[in-house]
């Protein structure tokens, strides 16, 4: 990847020195979650962000407004922790939907609260949801998440579909010895219920720092397993671009399955994302070890133009890649729950 000169090409977009332009903003609304997934959080002992450190609803909407009107952001995805635990979520969505230009809005969730919120979120302006579900077996779900809420997730998925938050996407992480035999069953279930299934390689973002590359279920493993039951055809001839998922038609279509090979086939060269943590820090990458503080600028009454300048400068320094293959790779201190997916 070639670097650009320091001329700051594209002064009104979030461009980096490799020419990548961020148009997709991930906003973490909380670091708290009502599950304890083994690949994300420890069972106990996490230090939560203090309430005064969290961005307020007004601060979140203001930063999104700056991103959309001054920095070229076209899509906003709300994440967590678990974003449905944020009391003001529906109001935030409604206010962002009123921005000009209006960004596309989606939500990544564990689905537990969707049964009671899906209709309100759709009415407020949310476009679609991504729901995490790694298994069809309640006992395995309890082992993976340390909570007995499998039925709630299934009901939440159904509620999202009925509310029109479509396409409903389901994200699944396969873990060796736990659910790595479920790929074909998960796909058959997704096809039956008209959900779009995406398998994601486990990434080194667990709070315990116990991830090992040699122990993960790879994209290749997943595709091999799926092909024992389904005919998979690579969708179209277009390059993958900034889309993280390699998509396949299932038995000739119309249903599709995606595989996100974040570790074995990373898409860093086409990354179009910028991330905002629940306490107002800009992160250029899931695996970044540096952050840029926007909360301090907000609370010191900095004008929008200054906040946009700080944000552009942060993204200008984005690294070429996550560096997972680099022997010097260091896992971020923040676990996934405190970064936002």
Swiss-Prot record:
Residues noted as binding [4Fe-4S] cluster 2 in the record, renumbered to the chain: 268, 271, 285
EC primary class: lyase
SUPFAM superfamilies according to UniProt: Radical SAM enzymes
Cofactor mode of binding and number, as noted: Binds 2 [4Fe-4S] clusters. Binds 1 [4Fe-4S] cluster coordinated with 3 cysteines and an exchangeable S-adenosyl-L-methionine and 1 [4Fe-4S] cluster coordinated with 3 cysteines and the GTP-derived substrate.
EC numbers, comma separated: 4.1.99.22
Listed pathway(s): Cofactor biosynthesis; molybdopterin biosynthesis
Alphabetic keyword roster: 4Fe-4S, GTP-binding, Iron, Iron-sulfur, Lyase, Metal-binding, Molybdenum cofactor biosynthesis, Nucleotide-binding, S-adenosyl-L-methionine
UniProt keyword S-adenosyl-L-methionine present: yes
GO molecular function: 4 iron, 4 sulfur cluster binding; cyclic pyranopterin monophosphate synthase activity; GTP 3',8'-cyclase activity; GTP binding; metal ion binding; S-adenosyl-L-methionine binding
Annotated Radical SAM core domain residues: 17-235
PROSITE patterns named in the record: MOAA_NIFB_PQQE, RADICAL_SAM
Catalysis: reaction(s): GTP + AH2 + S-adenosyl-L-methionine = (8S)-3',8-cyclo-7,8-dihydroguanosine 5'-triphosphate + 5'-deoxyadenosine + L-methionine + A + H(+)
Residues noted as binding S-adenosyl-L-methionine in the record, renumbered to the chain: 39, 81, 132, 203
Residues noted as binding GTP in the record, renumbered to the chain: 26, 77, 108, 169, 273-275
Binding-site residues for [4Fe-4S] cluster 1, renumbered to this chain: 33, 37, 40
One Pfam family recorded for the sequence: Fer4_12
Cofactor: [4Fe-4S] cluster
Keyword Metal-binding: yes
GO biological process terms held by the UniProt record: Mo-molybdopterin cofactor biosynthetic process
Top-rank taxon: Bacteria
Quaternary context: Monomer and homodimer.
Family listed: Belongs to the radical SAM superfamily. MoaA family.
Listed NCBIfam families: moaA (TIGR02666)
Annotated function: Catalyzes the cyclization of GTP to (8S)-3',8-cyclo-7,8-dihydroguanosine 5'-triphosphate.
Name of protein: GTP 3',8-cyclase
Native organism: Streptomyces coelicolor (strain ATCC BAA-471 / A3(2) / M145)
Gene name per UniProt: moaA
């Amino acid at each position: 990847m070639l670097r650009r000169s320091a001329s700051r090409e594209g002064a009104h977009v979030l461009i980096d020195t490799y020419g990548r332009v961020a148009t997709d903003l991930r906003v973490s609304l909380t670091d708290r979650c009502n599950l304890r997934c083994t690949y994300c959080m420890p069972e106990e002992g996490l230090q939560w962000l203090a309430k005064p450190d969290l961005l307020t609803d007004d601060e979140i909407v203001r930063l999104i407004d700056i991103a959309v009107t001054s920095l070229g952001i076209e899509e906003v995805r709300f994440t967590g922790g678990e974003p449905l635990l944020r009391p003001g979520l529906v109001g935030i969505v409604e206010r962002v939907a009123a921005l000009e230009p209006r960004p596309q809005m989606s939500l990544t969730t564990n689905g537990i609260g969707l049964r009671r919120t899906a209709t309100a979120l759709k009415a407020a302006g949310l476009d679609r949801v991504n729901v995490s579900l790694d298994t069809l077996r309640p006992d395995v779900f309890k082992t993976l998440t340390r909570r007995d809420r499998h039925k709630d997730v299934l009901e939440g998925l159904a509620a999202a579909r009925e509310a029109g938050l479509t396409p409903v996407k389901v994200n699944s992480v396969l873990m060796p010895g736990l659910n790595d035999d479920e790929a074909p069953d998960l796909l058959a279930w997704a096809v039956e219920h008209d959900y779009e299934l995406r398998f994601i390689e486990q990434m080194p973002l667990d709070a315990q720092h116990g991830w090992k590359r040699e122990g993960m279920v790879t994209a290749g493993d997943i595709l091999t397993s799926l092909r024992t039951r389904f005919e998979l055809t690579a969708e179209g001839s277009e390059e993958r671009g900034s889309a993280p998922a390699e998509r396949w038609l299932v038995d000739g279509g119309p249903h599709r399955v995606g595989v996100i090979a974040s570790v074995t086939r990373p898409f860093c060269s086409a990354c179009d994302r910028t991330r905002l943590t629940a306490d107002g820090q800009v992160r250029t990458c899931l695996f970044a070890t540096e952050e840029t503080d926007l909360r301090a600028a907000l609370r010191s009454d900095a004008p929008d133009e200054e906040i946009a300048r700080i944000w552009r400068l942060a993204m200008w320094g984005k690294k070429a890649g996550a560096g997972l293959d680099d022997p010097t790779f260091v896992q971020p201190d923040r676990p996934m729950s405190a970064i936002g997916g």
